[in-house]
Amino acid sequence: SCAGSCKCKNCRCRSCRKSCCSCCPAGCNNCVKGCVCKEPASS
């Protein structure tokens, strides 16, 4: 499950997209462990 509302749309990992509101850690390395939603870096 995903904590909070996910706002990052940079994820390109399909499995992560399906399981965690289109949000995943950099590199999509943690998809298998469950995505961790994070706020997008303020630019």
UniProtKB/Swiss-Prot annotation:
Full protein name: Metallothionein B
Residues annotated to bind a divalent metal cation 7: C37
Top-rank lineage group of the source organism: Eukaryota
Pfam families, per database record: Metallothio (PF00131)
InterPro entries associated with the record: Metalthion_dom_sf, Metalthion_dom_sf_vert, Metalthion_vert
Keyword set, alphabetical order: Metal-binding, Metal-thiolate cluster
Residues reported in the UniProt entry to bind a divalent metal cation 3: C2, C6, C11, C16
Amino acids binding a divalent metal cation 2: C2, C13
Region of interest (Alpha), ranges: 17-43
Binding site for a divalent metal cation 6: C24, C28, C31
SUPFAM superfamilies (UniProt xref): Metallothionein
Its biological purpose: Metallothioneins have a high content of cysteine residues that bind various heavy metals.
